[in-house]
Structures are given as C-alpha cells and as structure tokens.
C-alpha cells in the first residue's frame, strides 16, 4: 500500500495535525504555517489521493481516517477543514485516546441538507459529481470560487486556493468523486455526542457551503463543544482572517 505525504514543521511542545479539504492539499496551510509553527509541532498531510499522496483510489471516510492514523503522533490536537473536519471527527471517534482536542473549521458533521438541517442540497452535490466527469478543472474552479464568495478579499483568496491546487498534480476524478460521496452521505451528528475531549468549532459568517445556522443547533446537540463564528470570513477563515484563526488555536492550546 502507498504511503501518504506527511511533513512535520515547527517546534512547539504540542502536536497539531492539519487536514485539508476537498480538492486541495497541505499547501493550503502555507499562509499560517510560520505563525502556528511557533506554538505547535505541525503535521501537514496530503489526504490519500490528494496532492503528493498519489496512488490511492476513492475511499470511504473510515478508510481515509485509518490511512491517516497510521502515521499520526500518539497524542495531538486534530484540526480538519471542511472535508478534513469529517476525517478529524472520525479520528476522535475511533481513537479518542490519541486526540487531545478536536477542532473543525468551516465543517459540518452532515454537509448534506436534511429535514430540519441546513446544508448543501443533495442535488447540488450530485450535480458536482456529474460535472466532474464532464469538465473536471472547471468544476474544481467553481467549487473554489464558492469557498471565498462574499469576503472582502474574495478574489485574492480564490487565487490563493487556486494556486494551492495548481502547485500539485490534480487528484483523479475517482478520488474527487469519492470525496463528494463522503460529503453527500456521511452524518456524524449523533456519534459525536459521545466525544469528551475539548472540541472547538470555527465557522465563517459568510460561508456559502457550511451555513452558520448549524452553529447554534450543534451548541444544543453537543453542549460539551464550543463554537466561534468569524464575522467577515467565508469557507476559508484561515486564509481571509489568519490572525483571528491562529489566536483561537493559541487560546485552545493554553486551555489544555
């Protein structure tokens, strides 16, 4: 079996595993790497099939998490952005003893809209899957543009995300489809009631993919977790608001 690409950076006395979102790779953290590296030892990963972690096909959430867990430190804060938030959450469910704290960023335990639950309409996700096979690069570009929509630095942020994608070879369509399937079908709302490590959820007020309306719903469902909404951010708050993002993580570390 192939190994996933993994880089350690920084010299902080606390390990922080960073998991990127759909279609991207670990270069997405470049803008905050220096700042976070002074507080943490960072573990930068390309998820299986993405970036430099080549040779993997489509995976289920469980398979992806098991692959990442193989190389992970014994104890770390696990932070996942968007799709990566589901991987970090799954890690907290299957290996709670290895997760010092769980952080999800612009992520949802259930990305798909359901009755009484805001999210992405299932037909929109299905449409993305269809479009992937028709016009692969255009579809990824559209998805990236959606992530920064509404922020004061939207164009610049979208360019940053696009440069991250272009920095590595594009994931296979099969891998991207598998990621969309996870976003379309996974629902961790009930399972995550049982986690008892510190749990921080960060949202962007302007996020068009993960509606801020889920924050109060999850405050009620998971009273053991805390949420923070970054006011002028969209789906990539660590790019548009790096200072607020890094401050939230430094505060979490000092509370452990």
UniProtKB/Swiss-Prot annotation:
Question: From the UniProt record, which GO molecular function terms apply?
Answer: pimelyl-[acyl-carrier protein] methyl ester esterase activity
Residue ranges annotated as transmembrane are none
Q: Which GO terms describe its biological process?
A: biotin biosynthetic process
Q: What is its EC number?
A: 3.1.1.85
Quote the catalytic activity from the record: 6-carboxyhexanoyl-[ACP] methyl ester + H2O = 6-carboxyhexanoyl-[ACP] + methanol + H(+)
Where's it mainly located?
cytoplasm
Top-rank taxon: Bacteria
Keyword annotations from UniProtKB, A to Z: Biotin biosynthesis, Cytoplasm, Hydrolase, Serine esterase
Q: Which InterPro entries match?
A: AB_hydrolase_1 (IPR000073), AB_hydrolase_fold (IPR029058), BioH (IPR010076), Carboxylesterase_BioH (IPR050228)
- Pathway annotation from the record: Cofactor biosynthesis; biotin biosynthesis
Which part of the chain is the AB hydrolase-1 domain? 15-242
Q: What class of enzyme is it?
A: hydrolase
Q: Where does substrate bind?
A: 22, 82-83, 143-147, 235
Compartments (UniProt record): Cytoplasm
Catalytic residues? 82, 207, 235
List cellular component terms (GO).
cytoplasm
- NCBIfam families, from UniProt? bioH (TIGR01738), PRK10349.1 (NF007674)
Q: Could you tell me what this protein does? A: The physiological role of BioH is to remove the methyl group introduced by BioC when the pimeloyl moiety is complete. It allows to synthesize pimeloyl-ACP via the fatty acid synthetic pathway through the hydrolysis of the ester bonds of pimeloyl-ACP esters.
| PANTHER family, sorted | HYDROLASE ALPHA/BETA FOLD FAMILY, PIMELOYL-[ACYL-CARRIER PROTEIN] METHYL ESTER ESTERASE
Q: Which family does it belong to?
A: Belongs to the AB hydrolase superfamily. Carboxylesterase BioH family.
Subunit organization: Monomer.
By what name is this protein known? Pimeloyl-[acyl-carrier protein] methyl ester esterase
Q: Which gene encodes it?
A: bioH
